[in-house]
């Protein structure tokens, strides 16, 4: 299912001409039901003060990430701290998990962050590690090397049709592409497909097969979740065999590090361009939005975009070389920021409007039907206006979005338990993306002073994106606690991770009281109670 181009009305801004060759993109829209209303509203940009000229040196040749005697580090490793943004109400009013697995310890027990997160976090780990290179799966006993089916999360038997999948989903997809695909969902085309319910709805099972990336001729070259530039030839093949070398104690990690260092800024930008996720489409109903229908549309859209965001992250060169825990933490920390950056980019050519999807276009006044969302809309529109004033270019946007992901983990709770080697790799990768942004700005034809000012202006906006994300998360949690909209699947896991992290930060090492913990548990078991 290949969709060649996105709508022309949403093409990237073209105020500058970089003169770079752009690789063709293929996007596959996904259709989910929602509501649609459109009107117009002009929202002025928020006032930003201009910074002093930064003393930011631009290396003439960025081909090695190792620090040299004359090399100035260009990565802003501490752009912001992770604030505690959750209200106490959100911590004690959770909906029940979609997975019937018991909690093995209280949420706020003062132990490592890894053991305080919900059990359902394992699903996110499976999605993140689904395309890693590792040893073949020999059975449930080899859990350290096991892969999981991207469709139903059962143990995968191998890499079939472009993704890791079990024998059941492999055989089902094979039958479907051979002609037996006239399935009809008896419900709303939103059935949950997991190990226990994968046979309940063939239509939704086939839809999920396509969503996770199953194709008729799955390519083994994409086994690691990303592709380096083709000119690297044999070096790329070494990446795809990393699992075997790891078990034999080989030096593949060093080879990978060198390969990342060898990527020029231009090559890295082209790789980010290839990694861009497809647009998610929403059908247009004929009735105006209500609070429930708008929140349902936005949460469904976010849940679909999260799946593509994980695939996008794994295509960033070097991301899958981080520890699995660090990958999960990064995604949990910044998922809403990444989605908001994409929303701002889609909206940059449409003043006063928010382009959530090509056919879901909202203006500020339409948010009046949802309590508390106007403030979030205002922040999104204001930051988008600032990007518009700066005439943000597509390649700059690609680098900024990658920086939001990679720079989202600098807080004391995380760094205290972070693997040292993985932390070094993360800093290495952030340096590479920052150098790529510097290269993109330098290619725009600005003077040296203008380049420094532009870089400073772009980096200052990252804190405003974080602020909008915090406010959006607070609003989403309040809607969930009030039972305005049900939240399922991956979106529920991400929200639960934020609740746990907020609770962990608020107690600063002390345990939550038993009364509070029981109250939270009671709220999860009785989502319909006031």
From Swiss-Prot:
Transmembrane spans: none
PTM characteristics: Phosphorylation at Ser-87 and Ser-105 recruits NCOA1.
ZnF NR C4-type: positions: 149-169, 185-209
Annotated region of DNA binding: 149-214
Region (Modulating): 1-148
GO biological process annotation, one example: estrogen receptor signaling pathway
Pfam families to which the protein is assigned, alphabetical: ERbeta_N (PF12497), Hormone_recep (PF00104), zf-C4 (PF00105)
Location(s) in or outside the cell: Nucleus
Any one Gene Ontology cellular component term annotated for this protein: nucleoplasm
Cited InterPro entries: ER-beta-like_N (IPR021064), ER-beta/gamma (IPR028355), Est_rcpt/est-rel_rcp (IPR024178), NHR-like_dom_sf (IPR035500), Nucl_hrmn_rcpt_lig-bd (IPR000536), Nuclear_hormone_rcpt_NR3 (IPR050200), Nuclear_hrmn_rcpt (IPR001723), Znf_hrmn_rcpt (IPR001628)
SMART domains (UniProt xref): HOLI, ZnF_C4
Main localization of the protein described in the UniProt heading: nucleus
Glycan-carrying positions: 61
Biased composition (Polar residues): 521-530
Keyword set includes RNA-binding: no
Entry remark concerning the domains of this protein: Composed of three domains: a modulating N-terminal domain, a DNA-binding domain and a C-terminal ligand-binding domain.
Complex formation: Binds DNA as a homodimer. Can form a heterodimer with ESR1. Interacts with NCOA1, NCOA3, NCOA5 and NCOA6 coactivators, leading to a strong increase of transcription of target genes. Interacts with UBE1C and AKAP13. Interacts with DNTTIP2. Interacts with CCDC62 in the presence of estradiol/E2; this interaction seems to enhance the transcription of target genes. Interacts with DNAAF4. Interacts with PRMT2. Interacts with CCAR2 (via N-terminus) in a ligand-independent manner. Interacts with RBM39, in the presence of estradiol (E2). Interacts with STUB1/CHIP.
Similarity annotation: Belongs to the nuclear hormone receptor family. NR3 subfamily.
Name of the protein this chain belongs to: Estrogen receptor beta
Organism annotation: Callithrix jacchus (White-tufted-ear marmoset)
């Amino acid at each position: 299912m290949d969709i060649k181009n996105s709508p022309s009305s949403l093409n990237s801004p073209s105020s500058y001409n970089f003169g770079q060759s752009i690789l063709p993109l293929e996007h596959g829209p996904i259709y989910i039901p929602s509501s649609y209303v459109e009107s117009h509203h002009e929202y002025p940009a928020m006032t930003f003060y201009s910074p002093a000229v930064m003393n930011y040196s631009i290396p003439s040749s960025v081909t090695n990430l190792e620090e040299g005697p004359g090399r100035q580090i260009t990565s802003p490793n501490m752009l912001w701290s992770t604030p505690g943004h959750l209200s106490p109400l959100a911590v004690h009013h959770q909906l029940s998990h979609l997975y019937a697995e018991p909690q093995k310890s209280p949420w706020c027990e003062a132990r490592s962050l890894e053991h305080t997160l919900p059990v359902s976090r394992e699903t996110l780990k499976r999605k993140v590690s689904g395309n890693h290179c590792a040893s073949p799966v020999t059975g449930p006993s080899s859990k350290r090397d096991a892969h999981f089916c991207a469709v139903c999360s059962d143990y995968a038997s191998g890499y079939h049709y472009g993704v890791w999948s079990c024998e059941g989903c492999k055989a089902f997809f094979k039958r479907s592409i051979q002609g037996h695909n006239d399935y009809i969902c008896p419900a709303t085309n939103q059935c949950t497909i997991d190990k226990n319910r994968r046979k309940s709805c063939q239509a939704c099972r086939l839809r999920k097969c396509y969503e996770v990336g199953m194709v008729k001729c799955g390519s083994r070259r994409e086994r690691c979740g990303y592709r380096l530039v083709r000119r690297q030839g044999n070096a790329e093949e070494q990446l795809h065999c990393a699992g075997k070398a790891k078990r034999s104690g080989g030096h593949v990690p060093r080879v990978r590090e060198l390969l990342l260092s060898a990527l020029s800024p231009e090559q890295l930008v082209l790789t980010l361009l290839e990694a861009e996720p497809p647009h998610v489409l929403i059908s247009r109903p004929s009735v105006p939005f209500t609070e429930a229908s708008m929140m349902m549309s936005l949460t469904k859209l976010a849940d679909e975009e999260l799946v593509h965001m994980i695939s996008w992250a794994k295509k960033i060169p070097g991301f899958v070389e981080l520890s699995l825990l660090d990958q999960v933490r990064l995604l949990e920390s910044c998922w809403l920021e990444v989605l908001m950056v994409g929303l701002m980019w889609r909206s940059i050519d449409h003043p006063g409007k928010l382009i959530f999807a090509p056919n879901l276009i909202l203006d500020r006044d339409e948010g009046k039907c949802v309590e508390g969302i106007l403030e979030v809309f205002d922040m999104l529109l204001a930051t988008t206006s600032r990007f518009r004033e700066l005439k943000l270019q597509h390649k700059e946007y690609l680098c900024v979005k990658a920086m939001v992901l990679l720079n989202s983990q600098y807080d004391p709770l995380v760094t205290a338990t972070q693997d040292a080697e993985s932390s070094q790799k993360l800093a290495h990768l952030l340096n590479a993306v920052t150098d790529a942004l510097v290269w993109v700005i330098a290619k725009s034809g600005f003077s040296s002073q203008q380049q420094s000012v532009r870089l400073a202006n772009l980096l200052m906006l990252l804190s405003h994106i974080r602020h909008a994300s915090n406010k959006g998360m607070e609003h989403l949690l309040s809607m969930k606690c009030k039972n305005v909209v049900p939240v399922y699947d991956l979106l529920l896991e991400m929200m639960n991770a934020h609740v746990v992290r907020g609770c962990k930060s608020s107690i600063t090492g002390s345990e939550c009281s038993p009364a509070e913990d029981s109250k939270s548990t009671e709220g999860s078991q009785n989502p319909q109670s006031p």
